[in-house]
């Protein structure tokens, strides 16, 4: 932003703005220093969809299947650093499963 720091400028930023601060060393701003959060005005739901050929009907069944088949499942997202990508990586980390991330350049999320 090029506005003077007068307290009258409001910017709406998405999650990737905060995520990028952890992914990239050199940005033209410092997210922690330059931006002061005021309110969370939206929640971004995450939905997990699985191909019907995967024999899992619940999340625990999916986790068990993924652990039994490490690296054989793919996880798609709109792109590196997007909210679905980061939440997918968090899901992998929290469950101890191994899936291959497939980033698509289909849009921003």
Place the predicted regions along the sequence by residue.
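Beta->alpha turn/N-cap motifs
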Residues: 12-17, 107
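Hinge/capping helix and adjacent helix->loop/strand transition within the periplasmic-binding protein
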Residues: 2-8, 22-106
């Amino acid at each position: 932003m090029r506005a003077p720091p007068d307290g009258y400028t409001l910017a709406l930023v998405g999650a990737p703005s905060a995520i990028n601060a952890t992914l990239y060393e050199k940005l033209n701003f410092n997210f922690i220093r330059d931006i002061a959060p005021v309110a969370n005005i939206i929640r971004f739901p995450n939905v997990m969809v699985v191909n019907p050929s995967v024999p899992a009907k619940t999340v625990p069944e999916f986790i068990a299947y993924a652990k039994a088949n490490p690296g054989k499942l793919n996880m798609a997202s709109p792109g590196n650093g997007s909210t679905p990508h980061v939440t997918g990586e968090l899901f992998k980390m929290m469950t101890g499963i191994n899936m291959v991330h497939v980033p698509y350049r289909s849009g921003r999320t």
